[in-house]
């Protein structure tokens, strides 16, 4: 996986400038649409914000931007590991954010398929591989790869941002005990509410 640290965006996050984070990430991505770092981080920040706001208030502008990025990612960046990973992950967790014509279950399956493809195509990446381990084999695999997963989190997600904290937490859950994703999203919602 490429380095996804984005210092300018991370600084805005540290300063808790939510609207600036949203605007800066999207506008920078729009100026260089094939930049993978910009795409992954701008896509994630929108997904995260919408997950946080889900059920509280609608933000059609950000919803539309996320769907526009989704369409672009599918049509222009689909075979790029980091894009397929972030889109597959977000679709698996919240397919409702991407649905049209009530195709919720289809999108959830597509997210699983994308993550499975990423796992198969990246056998040397312990984190990405973890998304392709069958459930019945996962506990044994997790125990055998615990140290590698923890090191992966340190190597790839040790910068100061919501993105980094979120995925480092996910990696630690994969290394230790599996935690319900919904409960972590509730934590994210609490953080965003405090802003």
Regions found by a protein language model. Give the residues of each.
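Long, ordered, amphipathic alpha-helical scaffolds
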Residues: 130-195
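Short secondary-structure subsegments characteristic of cysteine-rich extracellular domains
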Residues: 103-122
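Solenoid-repeat scaffolds in large eukaryotic assemblies
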Residues: 18-22, 111, 141-149
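Amphipathic alpha-helical repeat scaffolds of TPR domains
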Residues: 1-7, 31-55, 78-97, 123-137, ...
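N-terminal alpha-helical scaffold/docking segments in eukaryotic complex subunits
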Residues: 1-34, 38, 195
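Residues in the short coil linking paired helices within alpha-helical repeat scaffolds
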Residues: 17, 96, 107, 137-141
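Helix-turn-helix repeat elements of alpha-solenoid scaffolds
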Residues: 11-25, 57-69, 103-109
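Solenoid-like repeat scaffolds
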Residues: 26-34, 74-79, 116-121, 150-158
């Amino acid at each position: 996986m490429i380095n996804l640290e984005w210092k300018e965006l991370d600084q805005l996050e540290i300063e808790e400038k939510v609207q600036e984070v949203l605007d800066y990430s999207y506008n920078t991505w729009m100026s260089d649409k094939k930049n993978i770092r910009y795409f992954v981080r701008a896509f994630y920040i929108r997904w995260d914000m919408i997950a946080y706001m889900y059920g509280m208030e609608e933000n059609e502008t950000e919803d539309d931007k996320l769907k526009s990025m989704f369409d672009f990612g599918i049509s222009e960046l689909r075979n790029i590991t980091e894009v397929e990973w972030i889109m597959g992950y977000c679709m698996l967790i919240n397919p409702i954010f991407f649905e049209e014509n009530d195709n919720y279950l289809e999108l959830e399956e597509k997210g699983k398929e994308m993550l499975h493809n990423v796992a198969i195509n990246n056998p040397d990446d312990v984190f990405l591989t973890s998304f392709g381990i069958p459930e019945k084999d996962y506990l044994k695999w997790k125990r055998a790869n615990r140290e590698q997963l923890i090191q992966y989190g340190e190597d790839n997600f040790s910068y100061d941002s919501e993105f980094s904290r979120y995925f480092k937490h996910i990696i630690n859950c994969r290394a230790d005990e599996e935690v319900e994703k919904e409960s972590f999203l509730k934590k994210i919602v609490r953080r965003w509410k405090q802003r």
